[in-house]
Amino acid sequence: VEQVHHISPDLVDFPGIKYILENHVPLALSDRSKELILKCRKYLDEKLAQAETPIYGINTGFGSLHDRSISRSDLGTLQKNLVISHACGIGEEVPTGIVKLMLFLKIQSLSYGKSGVHLKTVERLIDHYNSDILPVVYEYGSLGASGDLAPLAHLSLPLIGEGEVNYKGAKRDAAEVLREHGWTPIILDSKEGLALLNGTQFMSAFGVYCCLRVFKLAELADIIGAVSLDAFDGKIEPFHELVQKIRPYKGQINTAARFRKILEGSELMSRPKNHVQDPYSFRCIPQVHGASKDAIDYVSYVFQNEIN
């Protein structure tokens, strides 16, 4: 079992995420990610110090207030207010497993050094992940436009000592849990609130979770279908490789190949059959399972890109 997973610029994939979650592998930033985060923050500070014109979201207001200049002394307050003002989610609480996945994906996103956050901010997110101090996030509030603003605001509240967390089976004030761990609330600097809220880690966490579940369900569907065909004393001919080549859909071809692999060596399958053909529900399995797999492949492709 991997002792620590070092977050790096390398692409993350579904098997890797599954392994980390199932084995409760703690996170740490790689040296390369630390370097990228520090470099980006340095660039932003230098850019801000030299700026003669407003930079949106950094020394200006947001949205319709984009033409409102913000003084240097108020830049941190602007970011804090942004987080607090967007923490307006409603509905049921998001399951803690999804929230932990949100944390992982937000950490991964910030680790690329493209967002301008301070290193300490990312490290505090890692502290929350590793300690299972999971922010309370609500199901409704995201439009998915410039990001999952409301859910990510709730995810970010505990960083600044606000909001609530689920910790050791109880919902508690974040400030209280932070004090118990000796963690000082983060004082957000320019652009940090914007970086924390802009992102798709809420919808992506649900998407990754669903993909991991459906990968397993698709695998089980093939196994159940193959065993059922065997028990029914069915025919293997509809699963022949040449049949699939007539309509060369990837999912259909792979499903038929998987059935042939599962049923290889079956005594029932190899004995002569007296019936002409099996029920349609058996014969069309490659087409039905295959179409489902093609859809799964597309959805997982989209989420794979989104989380990287």
Segments predicted by a language model, with ranges:
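N- or domain-start disorder-to-order transition segments that initiate the globular core
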Residues: 1-52
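Glycine-/small-residue-rich beta-strand-loop submotif within the FAD-binding core of flavoenzymes
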Residues: 11, 15-19, 23, 68-98, ...
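Short alpha-helical scaffolding segments that buttress acidic/His motifs in well-ordered protein cores
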Residues: 17, 82, 86, 98, ...
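FAD-binding core of FAD-dependent oxidoreductases
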Residues: 56-70, 74-78, 85-110, 138-160, ...
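Alpha/propeptide regions of enzymes that mature by internal proteolysis
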Residues: 93, 113-117, 219, 291-302
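FAD-binding glycine-rich core of flavoenzymes that anchor FAD
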Residues: 114-140
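Mobile "lid/hinge" segments at catalytic clefts and subdomain interfaces of large enzymes
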Residues: 151-260, 264
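Accessory "access/gating" subregions that flank catalytic or transport cores
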Residues: 229-308
